Amino acid sequence: MSRKPIIAGNWKMNKTLSEAQAFVEAVKNNLPSSDNVESVIGAPALFLAPMAYLRQGSELKLAAENSYFENAGAFTGENSPAAIVDLGIEYIIIGHSERREYFHETDEDINKKAKAIFAAGATPILCCGETLETFEAGKTAEWVSGQIEAGLAGLTAEQVSNLVIAYEPIWAIGTGKTATNEIADETCGVVRSTVEKLYGKEVSEAVRIQYGGSVKPETIEGLMAKENIDGALVGGASLEADSFLALLEMYK
């Protein structure tokens, strides 16, 4: 089965509104065809509405970096999936290691978010990944499989087929370290095998799996050549228009 690549930037808590607007203006007319690749930027929630307006008519898709699992209520400071979808946003990133570590999000929280996002009409980008300690102990497969099983609990086969899963080894995020292409592919293969165990081969061959962790324009091509890697979730290299476009160059 042919899976369309998805290259997604994750800005985290960076940029001002004027910088975000300038970025969209710089990239929107220079992206490869969406027939070849999905080009996505994950931006702080404050910027999504003006970015969505500016990207009209272009190939650029947008992602929220988080959402809550309720659509309304007394949840001060949170953003609902329904409100995000109402802006025309296609994707919502959930389960990032920074959310798990700093905001104490659990697998159960992330699973609730996945269900709420699908119900609202967006697509989750579900993150998983292990610490350096887990990696060095040889327990990566066990750890990542556990995160996937918990994150997908109760989702339908159709939902999982449309899901994006991002494998990001925590020890390679923003550290300058990167997993070798072989390690990245092997662990993305673990993710795919876990999906197959839960939902069958057809679903596992449909789900798209990204690698994230210090991905750069000079390293992305080797990663994308691997069997189980269908895209990248990119932090630092997505912050500047030139480097984001360089990540997509092979698809032009």
Swiss-Prot record:
GO terms for cellular component: cytosol. GO terms for molecular function: triose-phosphate isomerase activity. Its EC number is 5.3.1.1. Involved in the gluconeogenesis. Catalyzes stereospecifically the conversion of dihydroxyacetone phosphate (DHAP) to D-glyceraldehyde-3-phosphate (G3P). This is Triosephosphate isomerase. It catalyses: D-glyceraldehyde 3-phosphate = dihydroxyacetone phosphate. One of its GO terms (biological process) is glycerol catabolic process. Homodimer. HAMAP family: TIM_B. Pathway: Carbohydrate biosynthesis; gluconeogenesis; Carbohydrate degradation; glycolysis; D-glyceraldehyde 3-phosphate from glycerone phosphate: step 1/1. Keywords: Cytoplasm, Gluconeogenesis, Glycolysis, Isomerase. PROSITE patterns: TIM_1 (PS00171), TIM_2 (PS51440). The keyword 4Fe-4S does not apply. The active site is at H96, E168. The keyword Isomerase applies. The gene is tpiA. Substrate binds at N10, W11, K12, G174, S214, G235, G236. It is found in: Cytoplasm. CDD domains: TIM. Belongs to the triosephosphate isomerase family.
